[in-house]
Regions:
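Accessory C-terminal helicase-associated subdomains
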Residues: 332, 368-486
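A short beta-strand element within the Helicase C-terminal
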Residues: 479-507
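C-terminal accessory regions
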Residues: 500-565
Length: 619
């Protein structure tokens, strides 16, 4: 079992004599990208007036995202096509600088003779797809398989499809593919429902298709709600009533967070484990109100892949401004957070530091917080972007001139005006949607200060305390938090969806079809309970809730549960195992299987338990 990337890496290893260096981490790939960026200006001297070359972390991250998109869609084909770069970049909806940077990146990665120096994330897929497209005689290098099974076809992109299509054409194995067009949510990475809708059928006319209409995750109540929402057949034979609750929140500060807390506490009172409950956000700015409410209720939580709001770049920047103005960095206890604040200050002040200079500054200030003042005086005020550093200097002077009792929220709002935060976000983040999320995060941070009604020193101290809570080592009694886009393929007993409002979900800056798919993914992560938290005002509610037709499908779902309960079921004979990591290969070789959801090894019911006696868990 392999991902397409792993498969491509294996095929290339059999074709190439040398082994390319592996850019195994984001840090290594960013360093490689910065090396390539140095060639963009010299190799494009006639475009110096339109190039926007920046070295800060946000710019490099956005470049790597655009590079991945170009490779996934095979729109950065090797050798170029003679197209004018300005025209090509505009047509591909990427900044000209990033397009030219991508060309230099690939020239640095692969020389004129085809020697590959390095490979990072997705590069094996891209390299193999390019080779198969340009050199048909390489098709025979693909392994001869009798059976090919592909899951998650809704995530497929042009490069991956090229490999799968060639593999099937060359050796003509039996093929089984599984995908759900309603789960296409990664269009920014080249995913497209066209592959499921007609591309596969066009390439393989004899391929039979079957509907994905049965769910084994949740019961009929949620199945029929999703059937109504997506206008497609969905059925569940589980004898399970998946509860769906609506908990509208009032139009007042903290109300949505309070409803989330009540939903979590009710789940706990029902005797359910907190770590089986996950709060899913449309995007990360929504977590601010919820994290604050959980902290206030003393409910421990942990984020899965997203950062706590106190660790996001725009909030770290404001925290850095406060620390400089107050001369108070000791409330930031974590050296890692101090280093992150330095990087955020360098990014938002547009300080042109080399990676080595930035690394040294981060290490120094993480060790000795008092040196933050020297960073402000010696770097931000001296070499930062002239306009940006002037605005930041005025903001710091303003903060230093405030009375100690001045309210923190008013001070932060004034700082955002001084630095022109909305314009700054739009300048740093190319895509309007990403800039809007940054702006909303900042607004949420200011709202937090307003709700606490504290002065600047007290608010700074509160942030330090809150960060310790958010960063505490989680125990088992821990609620989970993440963004919807990060949890596709996962499932949770209880899913809570807050802020189901107009303008939030669906988001007007995204295509409606992909927003529908994202909501579908969010709701269908739930197994036994789904809690929807919309605005109390019907005019502000997300239209997605009405489309679920919860009242209209209720009787049918009740009847289906009764029907499913009446069906006799065989007693499941599978037994869980208690296996140390060192013994996993042993039980696997005996036929044990791994339950990804429950994170436990088990013996299927058709196997004899005797060989597993030493690992049997208590029934």
């Amino acid at each position: 079992m392999q991902t397409v990337e792993e498969f491509a890496r294996q095929v290339l290893a059999g074709m190439e004599d040398a082994v390319p260096s592996a850019l195994a981490s984001v840090r290594e790939q960013k360093a490689f990208a910065l090396d390539a960026q140095e060639n963009v200006g010299p190799n494009n001297p006639d475009r110096g007036d339109v190039l926007d070359i920046r070295t800060h972390n946000t710019a490099v991250s956005q470049f790597l995202d655009n590079l991945l998109k170009l490779k996934a869609t095979l729109t950065l084909m090797r050798g170029g096509d003679g197209m004018d770069p300005e025209f090509a970049a505009e047509g591909l909806a990427v900044p000209l600088t990033d397009y030219l940077w991508a060309i230099e990146y690939e020239k640095q990665r692969i020389d004129l003779f085809g020697y590959v120096e390095a490979r990072g994330f997705f590069d094996s897929t891209y390299d193999l797809a390019c080779a198969l497209r340009t050199t048909p005689e390489l098709h025979q290098a693909l392994p001869a398989c009798k059976l090919v099974v592909c899951d998650e076809l809704h995530d497929i992109n042009e490069a991956s499809f090229c490999i799968i299509e060639t593999l099937l054409n060359v050796h003509q194995p039996y093929f089984v593919g599984v995908g759900d067009k309603d789960q296409v949510i990664y269009s920014h990475l080249g995913a497209d429902d066209a592959f499921l809708q007609y591309r596969i059928a066009a390439s393989f006319p004899d391929c039979a298709t079957f509907p994905l209409s049965m769910t084994y995750r949740h019961g009929p109540h949620l199945a029929y709600a999703m059937e109504a929402f997506k206008n497609k057949a969905v059925e569940s034979n589980l004898p399970l009533r998946t509860e769906i609750y609506e908990a509208p929140y009032a139009d007042q500060p903290g109300a949505c967070g309070q409803q989330v807390v009540e939903a979590v506490l009710q789940w706990q009172q029902d005797g359910k484990p907190l770590d089986a409950c996950c709060i899913l956000f449309r995007d990360q700015h929504q977590s601010i109100d919820i994290e604050n409410a959980l902290m206030q209720a003393q409910i421990q939580y942990r984020t899965l892949t997203m950062h706590s709001y106190l660790q996001r770049d725009e909030i770290l920047f404001l925290r850095g401004m406060l620390a400089i103005a107050l001369g108070d960095f000791h409330h930031v206890a974590s050296p890692e957070t101090r280093a992150a604040i330095v990087e955020a200050l360098a990014t938002f002040a547009e300080v042109p530091l080399t990676p080595q200079e930035l690394s040294e500054a981060k290490a120094t200030i993480a060790r000795d917080p008092a040196t933050l003042e020297y960073f402000f005086e010696g770097q931000i005020k001296r070499v930062g972007n002239p306009a940006a550093r002037a605005r930041i200097e005025r903001a710091v002077e303003y903060l230093r001139g405030l009375e100690p009792a001045a309210p923190a929220h008013a001070a932060l709002a004034a700082v955002c005006e001084f630095v022109e935060m909305e314009k700054l976000a739009q300048r740093l983040y190319v895509h309007p949607y990403e800039a809007s999320v940054v702006t909303k995060c900042v607004s949420g941070f200011i709202a937090t200060a307003r709700n606490l009604n504290q002065n600047l020193p007290d608010f700074s101290a509160w942030i330090g305390t809150a960060e310790k809570v958010a960063g505490a080592r989680p125990g088992k009694a821990t609620v989970l938090l993440d963004c919807v886009a990060n949890v596709k393929g996962k499932e949770f007993d209880h899913v809570i969806l807050p802020f189901l409002d107009q303008g939030e979900f669906p988001n007007p800056l995204r295509t409606l079809s992909e927003e529908e798919n994202l909501f579908y993914v969010a709701a269908t992560r739930a197994k036994s309970r789904l809690t929807l938290i919309p605005a109390q005002d019907p005019a502000r509610r997300s239209p997605f809730i009405a489309r679920m037709q919860l009242a209209g499908t209720l009787n049918r779902a009740n009847n289906a549960v009764r029907r499913n309960l009446a069906v006799p079921t065989a007693t499941a004979g599978r037994r869980d195992l208690k296996v140390a990591y060192a013994n996993k290969d042993a039980v696997k070789s005996l036929g044990a299987q791994w339950d990804r959801t429950r994170k436990v090894w088990y013996v299927p019911d058709h196997l004899d338990l005797e060989p597993f006696r030493n690992w049997l868990a208590e029934p």
